[in-house]
Amino acid sequence: MRKNPVPKKLRGSIKPIFSKNFRDRFQVDLINFRRLRKRDPFGVLMRWVMALKDHATGLTFICALPRKQAHLVAYKLQEIFGFIGYPKIFHTDNGKEFTAKCVLELLRNLNPNIVSVTGRPRRPRDQGSVENVNKMVKRVLGSVLAERRLAGQNPNWTEVLGSVAAAINSQSGRCKNDVS
């Protein structure tokens, strides 16, 4: 086993990300669903899912996107932020769909005090929380689709995203700061 040449004192320690209140920090990521290409009820071919997680409460929002493009991401973010309000910190991976001019302008227009933080993709120290949500979305979506197929339905995955989000958000122990 090789020793690390940098002394332990000089190496950066892993610092967990803490958020105390709702909307302190939102983490967002895109999930690839290109192999499950399905049309939504309006005939649009959906290939991606955007997962947005409030870091303090664990509240998760998911929505389908036809393409991995910045203007579509900005539109969905504006829709979600219009409903629940904007975050203090907007945390993403370094993807071009999150660092594009239209997304940064949207954040600036909502509130010039929003801090946009980018981490490295698929890195547990930066993106671990939202990557866990991605896994959970895939797992819960699979079980909801299987359950509906057993009931004799042939559901489209884009039509059950609301049920998937509700299942994720209603799991026990999801809210970190729950005092009850």
Question: Predicted regions span which residues?
Answer:
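Retroviral integrase
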Residues: 1-139
